[in-house]
Amino acid sequence: MVITRTREELYKTLKEFSKLPGKLALVPTMGNLHDGHLSLIKLAKLKASKTIATIFVNPLQFGKNEDFKKYPRTEELDIEKLKKEHCDILFIPRNIEEVFSKIEKLKTLDSGSLGSELCGKIRPGHFDGVLTVVNRLFELINPDVAVFGAKDYQQQFLIKKMAISLHP
């Protein structure tokens, strides 16, 4: 497994992997991987011949009363788990600037009225942050396929809607 921590390393690795035949599947995560995440890696491997996982604790999806700093970070364990699943590439940005450059204007996506309902009522701005980072990962990686968990139907619906709209 190739581990990348900078945008430059990511682009270089993706360029090398693009020379190989087959599709690339993306599995975005925030780390602290469990069996559900690993099942997504397995599913990605069924859908594509090359897999990339990301571990990025996205500060944009945490609200004022949610503690971004306390989110569990288990990087070494996560790396070992992904190696066992034969994930090809892992992108663990060393800092937020590797995802959202200071030079680029941050394009925050609006989840609309659906993002303000259900879970969005108690976590205002959460889905805007999720959509913004997933869109950015799509821009950086340009996967053929992306695999997401199904535990949060609202999030899954919003991501699918965004992907169809911005990445047809």
Task: Give the label of every model feature segment.
Residues 1-168:
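Nucleotidyltransferase catalytic core that binds NTPs
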